[in-house]
Amino acid sequence: MRLSPAPLKLSRTPALLALALPLAAALAFSDETLDKVPKSEGYCSRILRAQGTRREGYTEFSLRVEGDPDFYKPGTSYRVTLSAAPPSYFRGFTLIALRENREGDKEEDHAGTFQIIDEEETQFMSNCPVAVTESTPRRRTRIQVFWIAPPAGTGCVILKASIVQKRIIYFQDEGSLTKKLCEQDSTFDGVTDKPILDCCACGTAKYRLTFYGNWSEKTHPKDYPRRANHWSAIIGGSHSKNYVLWEYGGYASEGVKQVAELGSPVKMEEEIRQQSDEVLTVIKAKAQWPAWQPLNVRAAPSAEFSVDRTRHLMSFLTMMGPSPDWNVGLSAEDLCTKECGWVQKVVQDLIPWDAGTDSGVTYESPNKPTIPQEKIRPLTSLDHPQSPFYDPEGGSITQVARVVIERIARKGEQCNIVPDNVDDIVADLAPEEKDEDDTPETCIYSNWSPWSACSSSTCDKGKRMRQRMLKAQLDLSVPCPDTQDFQPCMGPGCSDEDGSTCTMSEWITWSPCSISCGMGMRSRERYVKQFPEDGSVCTLPTEETEKCTVNEECSPSSCLMTEWGEWDECSATCGMGMKKRHRMIKMNPADGSMCKAETSQAEKCMMPECHTIPCLLSPWSEWSDCSVTCGKGMRTRQRMLKSLAELGDCNEDLEQVEKCMLPECPIDCELTEWSQWSECNKSCGKGHVIRTRMIQMEPQFGGAPCPETVQRKKCRIRKCLRNPSIQKLRWREARESRRSEQLKEESEGEQFPGCRMRPWTAWSECTKLCGGGIQERYMTVKKRFKSSQFTSCKDKKEIRACNVHPC
């Protein structure tokens, strides 16, 4: 039950008026000045705080609902911003939400509820608790609150704001300070079946598509995939009615199937480019990991595209991942109006649809191909009890994304010659230039050169040319357009006056004054729409400057400042935080005093409520040193729990471990154990025994080399018996051995005339253990005969490769 506060009545006596004005906590929504304010007996007494004539703040102040929707969904939360364009500001304000055609003097006139974001900036009015006003009167340029949309059946709602700049300056609650939102039809499911009409618009129009993903654990908590949630890369195109990318009731192509199941846009882009005559622009935007982040952390993805009279439809899709085959997107959105113009803006909330190629019912269902393939259809809340969108009452599915398509320029001759904004004028200045959207993204060009002189030197038709350079072709399968462009022109010999005239655009609006206090300069520009046909130079001015005065009474101690920079990111990831912006001194005060203007500003910022994140964590520390000094190891980093998890368990990791790699460690030679000693090689007398070991690992990366692999030692069994017959046999063997050596030496001596050589030595050890080394052996002169020549009788040396295996 809501208690209505007693209405505050204003007396016309000066004493009570003086008391009422300082105590007022809000602006009035009445159109009368103070002298005409009647006593109010209604639910919210309207307290007038500002005197003077009402003024409309179409350019200075604005009331904006995030996403700029035209419709609201019952029960949905919307961020509302009230702002002033620099150098304007406001000290006080009042914000209310009324049903259409209601005065606000009854409780039931008000629609929805506001939610305070910053209690130091905003508060509910004490005498009108459904309205929001400032907490303290001071200079400000922006405030934000949340508005919770009313229940179904409320109808259209009007958000109204009033502004106080100074206590006796002005207030207003219409124009840019009024926002009308109508209730979204409960039967709306994102499916449209409107006929596609022939387009009668002229020229081309350029649009920007911005995709706002709202799919998060807060909005869709059931079975939300916390670790793999994402939107795939956006893929689509502007096309004619003869080509359909996808549509409800149709079957998914192979390209749509690969987007829906794999998140891959490659095949879809190939299909679109194959329809070259039916497609004007291929629309692409990068994927989003994770699916949702605040806009001050990650900007919403966007893409620009163009449309013309025959290709005035726009379609796109993106996969909701992970999912069986669920997507969101638009199909054949017509950007041409019945009045032969181009749509200014489209805002559409999106719900997921099923591509009909997989029969899974949950985000992470195993692959289950649908055989036979089914038609594309929107998901509903009654599809399956295990579905994350299931509602036994059959309610509508909460939208998972919003797409905003906004016209940013028009080119060429337009049927409707009245421009909607300055961008349209600027974009219409050079109709002879080709649309940049025709150039594939895989072709990187330099800028066009200036037009050359006309090829005709007489009063005759000729051609002029401009060029550009192809810097890179990223995909050789996609052809790149020409690097030269030609245009007809008239030679300079023409005497016709019209041949030397040039057509100019209208002047665009004046720039802001160059200073914030005192006398400064401002400028405006225009552009050459059509150069003289005779190829001569256009001499008409394209820029004008004039003096401007801002605050004539500013003192000599005032200083000139630059414009404010962009706001920093919010210092908090949830709840209340701070953000800052800065500016610099351009010129110090003329009287030599110190500049007292502020060079930095800080204001509070509101992130999603912290209860959606049960624990607040510090940033990750730096990675620790690797656990080893060489080779493969591990390293760690930590973060701390900054606040107690009072609203739930903190399941986030406080430590992370990853592998690290340092230069390889030296590997020493590895050997087997020694074998047993062999038997003595003699049966009597002196002999020897040996033992060996094998190399298991060659040394690597500078490791210790391999030691000996063979050892021998002496052995003596017993003295040999001196049997004469045996002794003679040994003498005979020794004699034959000496004779054999002599014959060998003589045969070797024949190879080197005049020399007797010793046998080759054994090969030396290899100079390297791996990677390729060398070995050497020698043959030395044993005896040189007198008849020998020195050049033919000398020591010999041989070299060979060894250990050629890699390290």
Swiss-Prot record:
Which domain of life does this protein belong to? Eukaryota
What residues are glycosylation sites in this protein?
A: 214, 448, 451, 507, 510, 564, 620, 623, 674, 681
As for subcellular location, the record says: Secreted, Extracellular space, Extracellular matrix
Q: Name one GO cellular component term.
A: endoplasmic reticulum lumen
Which residue ranges does UniProt annotate as crossing the membrane?
none
UniProt keyword Signal, yes or no: yes
Hey, what's the signal peptide range on this chain? 1-28
Q: What does the record give under GO molecular function?
A: extracellular matrix structural constituent; LBD domain binding; metal ion binding
Q: How does it assemble?
A: Binds to the central extracellular domain of APP and inhibits beta-secretase cleavage of APP.
Protein name per Swiss-Prot or TrEMBL: Spondin-1
What organism does this protein naturally occur in? Homo sapiens (Human)
